Each structure stands twice: as C-alpha cells, then as structure tokens.
A protein has these predicted regions:
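H-loop (His-switch) and adjacent beta-strand-loop-beta switch element
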Residues: 144-158
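Catalytic Walker B motif of ABC-type/P-loop ATPase nucleotide-binding domains
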Residues: 96-99
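H-loop/switch region of ABC-family ATPase nucleotide-binding domains
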Residues: 132-133
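Conserved catalytic motifs of ABC-family nucleotide-binding domains
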Residues: 92
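Short loop immediately C-terminal to the Walker-B catalytic DE motif
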Residues: 102-103
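Conserved ABC ATPase signature
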Residues: 71-75, 79
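Conserved ABC ATPase "signature" region
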Residues: 30, 48-67
C-alpha cells in the first residue's frame, strides 16, 4: 500500500528513451543502475559491497549482467531499456511505471521486454504500469488496460473480465 511521500521510493520509473540522448553519455551500465542507490549510499561516498551486489542482482534479473562495464551509449535500444528497468528495480519498488517502453526498439526486443515485465510481475509481485498509445499491441501482454482522458480513468480492457 502506498500512502505518503515516504512511499515514493516504492515506485520505480522507466522513462521513454531515445538512443540519441544516451549515445555519448559517459557512464557504464553499472553506474547508471547505481544512481538509484545514491540516497542509500550517501552524498560523495563510494558504494559499499552490498550496493554493488544489489546492482549485480538486478542486472542479472534483466539479463544484462555481462554488460555491466559497457557504456550505455554502446547498447541497443532494447538493451538500454533493460538497463533502465534494472535501475528502477534496484530500489526494490512495489510498482514500476514505464513510459512508452517500446519506443525505438525492434520487434524481437519488444517481445523480450514484455516477457521480462510479465516475469517481474509474476515472480517478484511488482505491479507494472505501462503508459502507451498502442492499446492493441499491449493487450496481448497485459491483464488490464485503463484509459485516462480529461482527468477521468476508465477500465477499457480486462483479460479476466474483472
């Protein structure tokens, strides 16, 4: 249950990515994921072994453990999206919100990404919220679809009829 601002750390966020925005960014996969632990690490302090282990754990969950030392700009769109999901996961969220997560990735990466999100939902009991304009496509992968229009939220699809 999320109730107050102290619960904001229970929400992970994955922004819509653009390959051009990461192309020259001089940070490794490991460093990108670690940024979501800075509130626990402390200002101007080095990560402890437990922080590094947590980063390794989430990179493994998203199948990016072999890319930890690679620069983010040297990855494909699908790989970058997995890194952003790992970044969200590292803070142990109860909910992950993804903004247009399949923008800029190919069909195979898209299918793999949705399979990963489904696995996280089922195995880790994380609620996944996807912001998308492609209702038809996401209906293949989701349990429910809501529409937000003029401050009104409506259920427009439910796999189980609930």
């Amino acid at each position: 249950e999320l109730s107050k601002s102290k619960d904001l750390n229970k929400i992970g966020y994955v922004p819509q990515i653009s390959l051009s925005s990461n192309a020259t960014f001089p940070a490794t996969v490991e460093e990108i994921v670690m940024t979501n632990l800075y509130s626990k690490i402390g200002f101007m302090k080095f990560p402890k072994k437990e922080h590094k282990e947590k980063v390794k754990e989430v990179l493994k969950k998203v199948n990016m453990q072999d890319y930890s030392k690679r620069l983010i700009g040297n990855l494909s769109g699908g790989q970058q999206q997995r890194v952003m999901i790992a970044k969200a996961l590292v803070s142990d969220p109860k909910v992950i919100i993804l903004d247009e997560p399949t923008t800029g990735i190919d069909a195979a990466s898209e299918k793999s990404l949705y399979a990963l999100l489904n696995k996280l939902n089922k195995e880790s009991k994380i609620t996944i919220i996807i912001v998308s304009h492609d209702f038809e496509k996401i209906s293949q992968y989701t349990n429910k679809i809501f529409s937000v229009n003029k401050n009104k939220v409506s259920l427009i699809y439910s796999k189980n009829g609930v």
